[in-house]
């Protein structure tokens, strides 16, 4: 009986020994930094733009893991009432461990108003998708 207890203790000690104390949660695998509106050349535009002005909804995506990660960068734009007026995505980007990559989606507003762009980073899109980080948002004023 003592032998089984010691064996279990050894297995438990090995399992605890290889589990990192700093393991990332599912939503910490990537981070979304510096969300902004930019023109086609990457010049920041601020949050006030014009109707029919083509912009890029941009952010830096950081892979916080010790392994490579394929991502999908998704942006949905909502109007003041919360209705989605635009959805765009880029798939197939692979980030190396701790790599940061600037990604963007183009949008041309067709009417004036207040909008919110929500930026998501997922894996497995469009099938079996999982969030890799919390989403972030940008407020946009169109005149």
Q: Which residues are covered by each model-predicted region?
A:
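Short, compositionally biased P/S/T/A/G/V-rich stretches that sit at domain boundaries
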Residues: 24-51, 143
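Short, hydrophobic beta-strand segments
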Residues: 103-111
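Short proline/glycine- and polar residue-rich coil/turn motifs
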Residues: 92-101
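Short, acidic/polar linear motifs in exposed loop/turn regions
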Residues: 63-67, 81, 111, 125
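Secretory targeting signatures
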Residues: 1-27, 59, 75
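Short edge beta-strand/loop segments characteristic of extracellular beta-sandwich folds
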Residues: 56-64
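Surface-exposed loop/edge segments in extracytoplasmic proteins
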Residues: 82-90, 128-129
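Terminal connector regions
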Residues: 71, 76, 111-142
């Amino acid at each position: 009986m003592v032998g089984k207890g010691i064996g279990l203790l050894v297995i438990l000690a090995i399992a605890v020994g290889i589990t990192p104390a700093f393991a990332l949660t599912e939503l910490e695998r990537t981070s979304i930094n510096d969300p902004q509106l930019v023109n086609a050349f990457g010049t920041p535009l601020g949050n006030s733009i014009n109707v029919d002005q083509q912009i890029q909804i941009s952010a830096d995506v950081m892979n916080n893991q010790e392994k490579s990660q394929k991502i999908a960068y998704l942006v949905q734009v909502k109007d003041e009432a919360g209705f989605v007026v635009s959805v765009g995505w880029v798939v197939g980007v692979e980030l190396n461990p701790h790599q940061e990559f600037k990604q963007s989606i183009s949008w041309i507003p067709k009417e004036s108003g207040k909008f919110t762009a929500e930026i998501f980073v997922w894996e497995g899109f469009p099938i079996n998708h999982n969030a890799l980080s919390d989403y972030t948002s940008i407020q946009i004023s169109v005149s």
